[in-house]
Structures are given as structure tokens and as C-alpha cells.
Amino acid sequence: MGPTISIGEALDRYDIDNARYAGSLQTDISAWLRLRNDDSQIIILHPDHRPPVKYEQDIFETESLVPAMNAARGVKDSYEIELIRKANIVSGLAHTAVLEKIGQMTNESDIAGLFLETCMTHGAPEQAYGIIAASGENGATLHYMKNNEDFGSRLSVCLDAGAEYECYASDVTRTFPISSTGEWPTTEARDIYLAVERMQEECIRMIKPGVRFRDVHIHASVVAVEELLKLGVFKEGNSVDEIMASGAVSVFFPHGLGHHVGLEVHDVSEQSVMAATDDMSPRMRARGFLMQPASMMSAALLEANMIVTVEPGIYFNRLALKNARTLPIARFIDFDVVERYYAIGGVRIEDDILVTTDGYENLTTAPKGDAALAIIRKSSVKNSRS
């Protein structure tokens, strides 16, 4: 378990007003009982936090603290924003380090190891979540975390990894070619990346106070349908509206557009932007991008100083597409065309976006798109000369 931290260390680490050792709890409560008003209660977070001591009266209130804390955590103060900004800076350095070395790497573990090492050397020894370094078709598995397969002839990597800094998370995903030339190895890989890039860029531009995040998610889905129609994945002759109404887009974009970021990578709030249930511990929840979209009326509105991810993706998951063949939505999908895209696995691009009073600020500094490809090319030339 390691050494017990001191009270001073606890005050500094958790930015709290008071801290006591657990051994003094019974004495402290007994002293409080002698002085309290008859209607006073001790407010605790969960029923299972009750001290293992019986009292004559029920002095513990367990209902009000969780929603109050959730509401407070949804909107960040300037101190929290700067810590999340710092976490993103460290993550950006780690993502850049991977891009600089990808041409020399041969296994997913090389990526995960370098990412973690870079974060640790820049003051962030903890990851906000388990690193996902998914090469080739592994990129179609949202929670792929084996990180141990050789690249072989695979086309690309979906790297979902973010540092934690002073208890605050970042959440960053980049997809890039496994290449020493900095070029997409196939037209199909490039086209899917550009489609997701368009999804993300248009959605980020929509972020501002008063916007219903569910509407931004719907826009991402519409763009995905438009792009997949252009590529022939959805059959010509079907309209965007028809495909959207059928739900067929969920085969390729099966998750929500984003979630809050804060003390947890999928942070709590008064009302989750994608209708996740906030009555369970964040550690016990599915990852944010797996939460089911809310109904139009229940989805939350964005407020200034919220920080949310914008993480669209397009995936070619063999199991999902095999199942789709048995469903009514199969009539919209050209499965012969789909065969050309399986090798891509999945493409996801994810940034952490601060909602400002009049728009947004992108806190994520990790290179993406053309900037990422340029780093791969430059590093390849440099490494060939050394």
C-alpha cells in the first residue's frame, strides 16, 4: 500500500480545508455529538461510508452530497482548468514522442511503453486510464487494451492515451499510419481519416454555451453518413435522412460523441452530456464514449467552463457488421465495399474542449492530421541520417 501520507500532504494534494486520520473518527464524532443541535446531521457521500460505530440516533445524511458534488464538478474553476491544460500538455508531448518513433516500432507495446515513459519524465506518473494502442483491425475494438501485437503489414494505429496530472485527467486519441514516410498506405485509410477529421472539426466549431451536446452528436452522425455515402459504404440512392432514421450509422459510429473530463476521465456532472447515469461510481462505469445518447429533451446544455471531449470515430468491426447483415439496416450497406475497409480497423480523433463564454478553446496540444504526418516524415529523415 505504500506509506501513509501526512495531513499536510493530504491538504496539498486534494486541495481541501481539513483532514484527519481515520483513527480519530470515533472520538471526533463523539465530541461533535455533545455540541450539535438536535436537527444537525453529518453529511456523507455514500451509505457505505458510515463509520463502523453505532449511535443512538441516525445522524448520517446520505442523499444530498452526491448530487451537489456532481453539479459542482460539471463546471470547472480556473485552478481545475489549468491542471487539465497541464495534463493535456504532457499528453501532447507523449503523443509527439510516439509519432517521432513510429517508423522504428514493431509492436503495440513499443507505443504504450514510450507513451508512459514520456509522461513519467514530465511529472505525470499516472495515466488517466489504461493506454489503448490498437493497430490494424484492433482499432475496431473500442476497449482494446492488450497492446502486445506485432504490426506486421498493418496500416495504422488508433492511440487513445492521456496523462493524469495532480489528480486531473486528459483524454486524447490520435490515429496515424504505421509508416516511416508519413503517408497513408491506402486510399481507403486516408479517406476514412479525412471523414472523421471533418466530423471532429465541424463538431468542435459548434461548441459554445447553450448548445445541446446531443445536437452536436447528431451532427457528427450526419457527417459520417454523408462521408460513407460518398465512399460507397452506404449504397447510392439512399438519402441521409433515410439512413439516419434507420440507425444504420451506429454500426460504424457506435458510441456517443463525448463526455465531461475532470477528476475522472469520464467525469460526473449534474446531468451527463450524453445521459450517462451519474448515480454510480465513475470507476464502475463504462468508458464515456460508450454511454447511450439521451433523449432530445433530457440531454444537457453546455455551460461556460465545462470541459468535454469531442471524439468521433468510424469503425469497421467484423462482428458488428456480421450482425448487421441479419438486420433490416443491411439494405443500406454495401458489404462488398466494406471488405476494402476492414484492414483500417477504426479511426478516432479526440480532443478536450473547454467551453468559453463565447465559444470554445481546444486544450489538447497533441499533433493530428497533416501536422502529425509531417512529424513522422521529418523524424524518418532524421533517423535515416543518424
From Swiss-Prot:
Co-factor binding comment: Binds 2 manganese ions per subunit.
InterPro entries noted in UniProt: Creatinase/aminopeptidase-like, Pept_M24, Peptidase_M24B_aminopep-P_CS, X-Pro_dipept-like
Reaction equations catalysed: Release of any N-terminal amino acid, including proline, that is linked to proline, even from a dipeptide or tripeptide
GO MF annotation: an example: metallopeptidase activity
Keywords for this protein: Aminopeptidase, Hydrolase, Manganese, Metal-binding, Metalloprotease, Protease
Gene3D superfamilies per the UniProt record, alphabetical: Creatinase/methionine aminopeptidase superfamily (3.90.230.10)
Source species, domain of life: Eukaryota
Family note: Belongs to the peptidase M24B family.
Protein name (database record): Probable Xaa-Pro aminopeptidase PMAA_074180
Source species: Talaromyces marneffei (strain ATCC 18224 / CBS 334.59 / QM 7333) (Penicillium marneffei)
Taxonomic lineage: Eukaryota, Fungi, Dikarya, Ascomycota, Pezizomycotina
